[in-house]
Amino acid sequence: MTSPRTEGERGEKIAVYAFPLVIIACAAVAFMSPSTFEPVGQYTKQLLMVIMFSMGLTLTIPDLSLVAKRPMPIFLGVICQFVIMPTSALLVAKALELSDAATVGLILLGSVPGGTASNVMAFLAKGDVALSVAMTSVSTLVSPIMTPLLMLWLAGETADVDGKGMMWSLVQTVLIPVGLGLLLRVIASKAVDKVLPVLPWVAIAGIGAVVMAVVSKSQDKLVTVGRIVFVGVAIQNVIGFLFGYYLAKLARERESAARTTAIELSLIHI
C-alpha cells in the first residue's frame, strides 16, 4: 500500500511540471476573453487565503523551529530583495534602453516583496515553505520604508506605499491562513496526511484563478506594452533566481534554503 508521503511526493512532482503549463494556459485564455474572467477578480483575496491555508497544512512545528534557529537565510533574502533586485533592475533598464516609464516600472518591480506564488513554488520545488513565508512576511513589513526610499533614490520618483494596508493584507492572506493550516495539521495530522497529495493542485488552481483575474483586468495594458519590456522583466527574474541561489550556497545554506531564496527573489510580488 502506498504511503501518504509517497503519494504526496508523486503529486508534487507532477505538479512541478504542470504548474507553468497551467499558468500559461490560464493567462492565454484570460487574455483572449477578458470579460469572461474579470469577475474572478472580486474573489482574489479569498483565493489567496485558500492557497496559503493549503500551504499551512504542509508545515510542521519542527519546520518553524528550524527557521527560528537559523535566521541567516531570512536576513540574506531581505538584503538581496532590497539591494540587488532594485539595483539590477536599473542596470537592466539602462542596458535595454527602456523608456522612462518602463524603467520606473521595472525598478518598482525590483523594490517590492515576494508574494503568494513564491510560497507555492517553494513548496512545489522542495524548498522550505516556512522560510518562504518568513521571508515574505519580513520583506512585506520592511517594504513600506524601503520601497519609497529605493524609488526616490534610483528612479527619482516617489512611491506611495500603504504600510498599514500591506501589513493587514499580510495578516489576512498569509499569517492567519498559514496559522490555521498549521494548527489543523497539529490537531488532525492523520486526516491532513490523507489530503497531502491534493494540496499542490489546490495551490495551482488558486494561482491559476488569480492569474486569470489579473490578466483579464490588465489586458488592454498588456497589449500596449512593448516586447522589450517583457524581455527586461524576464532578465530581472533570472537575475533574482541566480543571485538568490548562489549567494545562499556561498553562505553555506542547505539546498532547500537556497532554492527558497532563489524563488523568493525571482517571483517578486506575485
Q: For each of these PLM feature ranges, what is it?
A:
Residues I268-I270:
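Conserved small/polar residues in nucleotide/adenosyl-binding loops
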Residues S54, F75, I107-L108, V120, ...:
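Hydrophobic/aromatic side chains embedded in well-ordered alpha-helices
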Residues P86-T87, S111-V120, T140-L149, W153, ...:
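Mid-bilayer segments of alpha-helical transmembrane spans in multi-pass integral membrane proteins
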Residues D63-L64, A89-L96, V104-L109, G115-V129, ...:
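Generic transmembrane alpha-helix signature in multi-pass membrane proteins
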